[in-house]
Amino acid sequence: VRLVGSEMCIRDRSRGLKLLYIGDFDYDDADIESCHDAGVEDFLNAIYSARYVITNSFHATVFSTIFKKKFCSYAVSRTGTRVLDFLDDFNLQECRIDDLNRTDYSFNQKIDWDEISSIINRKKQGSLKYIRSIVNQDK
């Protein structure tokens, strides 16, 4: 994912973008700021403050959506199903990175945030209904 992010950062340097990497890997690259010990607040703030998010993390994918950020998500093998299912459930297939060798991904995709909010509300109502049915079943 770094290659994709680095290429996008380089292409968008005129916009003053920098690349922040949160994870365990060290990059010897002046254009990449690394953060190895990001706690929950740092992680969420990085996404909230970002103009764009490039991730292979399920949670970063979800929070990019919650915070209404333009993003691209690469589904790695260990979490890939969750990421792909999430993108499908929210009609966000355009935000999917399929090939890490490509560096021409764009953040020009049109995301219908009203539709996303509607889907979130429907899923929330379905979850509440399920929880209530379980709680009432125990009475």
Across the structure, where does each feature detected by a protein language model lie?
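Leloir-type glycosyltransferase catalytic cores
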Residues: 88-139
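Short, structured coil segments at secondary-structure junctions
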Residues: 4-5, 15, 67, 90
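A donor-sugar binding/catalytic signature common to diverse glycosyltransferases
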Residues: 46-86
